[in-house]
Structures are given as C-alpha cells and as structure tokens.
Amino acid sequence: MIINHNMSAINAQRVQGBVTGVTKNMV
C-alpha cells in the first residue's frame, strides 16, 4: 500500500510538472 501510494504521488507530481512546463511554454 505504501509503495502504491508513493507511486501515485510521484505520478501526480509528474503530471503536475508537465502541466506547469506547458503553461510556462505558453507564457
């Protein structure tokens, strides 16, 4: 469970980072 939770957190952070990168490129 802990490993799965960490994986989910990493995936969420990765997606958030991708969105932030796209936003910066648009700006």
Curated annotation (Swiss-Prot):
Q: Where in the cell is it found?
A: Periplasmic flagellum; Periplasm
Task: Give any Gene Ontology cellular component.
Answer: periplasmic flagellum
Q: In this entry, which stretches build a coiled coil?
A: none
For whether the record's keyword set contains Protease, the answer is no
Top-level taxon in the UniProt lineage: Bacteria
Q: What keywords sit in the KW lines?
A: Bacterial flagellum, Periplasm
The record's family statement is: Belongs to the bacterial flagellin family.
Q: What does this protein do?
A: Component of the core of the flagella.
Oligomeric form and interacting partners: The flagellum consists of an outer layer composed of repeating units of FlaA around a core that contains one or all of five antigenically related polypeptides.
This protein is called Flagellar filament 34 kDa core protein
Q: What is the originating organism of this protein?
A: Spirochaeta aurantia
